[in-house]
Amino acid sequence: MTPVRSAPSGRTGTYHVPVLLSEIETMLANATTVLDCTLGGGGHTAAFLERGVRVTGVDRDPRALAAARERLGEYERSGQFRAVLANYAALEEAGFSTDDRFDGILLDLGVSSHQFDDASRGFTFREGAPLDMRMGTDADLDAGELLNTIDEVDLSALLRAYADEPRAARMAREIVRRRERRPFATADDLVDAIRAVLGPRSGAPDFARIFQAVRIAVNDELSGLERALPALRDRLTPGGVLAIISYHSGEDRLVKNAFRDWSASCVCPPRQFVCTCRGRPLGDTITRKPVSATEQEIDQNTRARSARLRAWRSA
C-alpha cells in the first residue's frame, strides 16, 4: 500500500479518495438512510450527505471519528449526520436499538489511508515504525505483544491462514527464536525476521502480506466480520442494500458465502429436517461476481487495486 492522491476540492477539503465511490453510489442510489460501518476519513459518507441522505457513521478508531466529525461538522449540527464510536461487530454495545434500520449499509474493510499514512499507528513496515496495528482501543493486544507472546503453533497457523504463507512454520519458528533474544518492538524487527526466511530478494509485497496477517489477528477482523454479517443483514429495511468492499481473500470468501446462503431458496439450518422458512430467500445477490476498480481508478488510488465489492439486497 502507498499513500493515495488527495480528493478534488469539490469533496469538502483535502482528503483521500474513497475506493469504488461511483459504484457504491450507484448500488445505494435509492437509499435515504445509510449506516457507514467503517467511517474512516468520511469519503463515502460525504458523498451521501451531499445527496441529502441521512447517515450514521461508525468507527472503532477515536482519531478517525474525531477527524470525520470535524470534516462533516456542518451535517452533524443539522442532524443529517451522526457519528458513533463503535466496532461494527458490536453495535448493540454502543447503544444501537434492534429497531434501528437502514436502506443502505456500507463496509469498507481493512486499514484506512489515514491509519496507514500515520507511521505512529504501526500499520506500516516503514523503518522504525512501532508494532502496534490496533484499529481501536478495543483490541486486547498490539502487534508487538501478539508476536512476543503467541504460541509458535498458533503463529504458524495464523500466517498460513491469513497470509497464505507456505513457509509459515519456518517463519513462526524464526520469530520465536528472535524474540527469545530480544522482544519485537518495531517494524524493522518483523521485516528482518521475514527476510531471514524468505531471503534477501523478499520485498514490499511479502512484507505487506505478513503485516496484513498480523493486523487481521490483532483486530480480530475475520471473526468480527463473520459475527457482524447476519446482524447487519437484519438491520436492512425491505429492499435495503448491504455493500461490502474487501481487500483480503478471507474477507471476500466470508462475504461471498454469506450472500450465497441468504439468496438460497431455503435458508433453514442444514440439520433441520423440516423446512420452516417456506422456501423464501432472504434476498438476492446484486453482484454475481465481485466488482473491481478500473485501471483509471487504480492509477489515481493504488489502494483500490485489491478492492473487491459485493452487494446484496434484502427481500
Swiss-Prot record:
Any Pfam family hit: Methyltransf_5
Reaction(s) the record says it catalyses: cytidine(1402) in 16S rRNA + S-adenosyl-L-methionine = N(4)-methylcytidine(1402) in 16S rRNA + S-adenosyl-L-homocysteine + H(+)
Record's GO cellular component terms: cytoplasm
InterPro entries xref list: RsmH (IPR002903), SAM-dep_MeTrfase_MraW_recog (IPR023397), SAM-dependent_MTases_sf (IPR029063)
EC number: 2.1.1.199
Gene Ontology process terms (BP): rRNA base methylation
Key words of the record: Cytoplasm, Methyltransferase, rRNA processing, S-adenosyl-L-methionine, Transferase
GO molecular function: rRNA (cytosine-N4-)-methyltransferase activity
Listed PANTHER family: 12S RRNA N4-METHYLCYTIDINE METHYLTRANSFERASE, S-ADENOSYL-METHYLTRANSFERASE MRAW
Family: Belongs to the methyltransferase superfamily. RsmH family.
Protein name (record): Ribosomal RNA small subunit methyltransferase H
Source organism: Gemmatimonas aurantiaca (strain DSM 14586 / JCM 11422 / NBRC 100505 / T-27)
